[in-house]
Amino acid sequence: MEGPPLEVLKSSSPVKHSTFWLFMGLAVLVGLLTGGLVLYLHRRKRHIPTDDPIKALEPDKKLSVSNSNTIFLFGDFQIFDRDGADITKLFTPLLKELFLLLLVNSVKNGRGLYAEKLDEILWFGRSEQSVRNNRSVNMAKLKSILESIEHCQLLKEAGYWKLEFDYDFWYVDYHSYLDLIQAKEKLDEQHIRLLFELAQRGNFLSNHNYEWLDQFKAEISNEVIDVFLIYAHSAKAHNPEFLIQIANFVFNFDQVSEEAMIIKCRALSSLGKHSLAKKAFDVFIKDYRLIYNEDFNKNFNEII
């Protein structure tokens, strides 16, 4: 009576065994196909530029994770090579101005600077021969520095000198800044914090006073103030403590910004810090009087 069951068990064992390995093989195959598809999409996404400047910057990713292949223009000018070594000292005063002049214009407009304009800015009043010699020598020196840092080159195209960076390998804070402000009406708190982090190193090239730079500095200051105030007045701004930070940051660019003062005082009041709100107002009207030599035309109760 026990014979037939034993025969059944004996014949079913290899079936189960082969079925098991069949499913295992299919699982491995599906895993490999899925992994390959994910890798393909990841690489494709990395190399296709997005039309949305907001999506181009990840909100949960800090702008400056490390100093490797990094150029800072906000605050002190600094440039770091791929190993994170500060190579700013390699730039003589003239080379530094040449580099910054080309960098700012290249990042801003993508074309760089017209050759004649470059000569006019750096060697105005010199003979044509002197200008040619100076340009040739300093361009060669700049190329020598750039050749040592990779993924960056000095080019001349259609009469324009420009610097070209591969932003997959380089972080340039001014480039990230321009990406952020292109869609200032769409910025949320996360992206405002990115801008805050970017600009908190200081004003744009704060220790450099080139005449040609004044226009860029004024434009950036106005843009930063504009972006922060647009956000502060939007429906997205509902964090009073963050609004106070924004107001304080605007004051770094404009000491007597009436809008920043109102934002700060109202935010402090909403937190129940009425005495601090009044103190902030008093500091503002004192600075206003010193700068404009006249009294501010509103009282505290009017702005709250």
Protein language model annotation of sequence segments:
Residues M1-P14:
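Membrane-proximal extracellular "stem/stalk" segments
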Residues S11-F23:
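Short, low-complexity patches enriched in S/T/P/G
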Residues W21-I263, S269-I304:
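Intrinsically disordered, low-complexity protein-interaction/activation regions
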